[in-house]
Amino acid sequence: VDISSTKSMTGHLLGGAGAFESMVCLLSMQNNVIPPTINLVNKDEDCDLNYTPNKSINKEVNISMSNSFGFGGHNGVLVFSKE
């Protein structure tokens, strides 16, 4: 599973963050590209995740997920699928 964070490119968009992330997920699926997490230089060795550092990846994207963890414990997850 490829991991990416758009917040590295935009900063925190507060109330618009979830909507923006949803658009990025849909565009990622439409264009078959995984956006990078920019400025990711030193990965935590204890976090064994498949990050997408500094450069996008062109590959088929059929499912994407957006996690939104808000202030005061208001959290939401959206999963998008081409099917």
Regions found by a protein language model. Name each.
Residues V1-M9, A17-F71, S81-E83:
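Structural signature of cysteine-dependent C-C bond-forming condensing enzymes
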Residues N75-V79:
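Short beta-strand scaffold segments in enzyme catalytic cores
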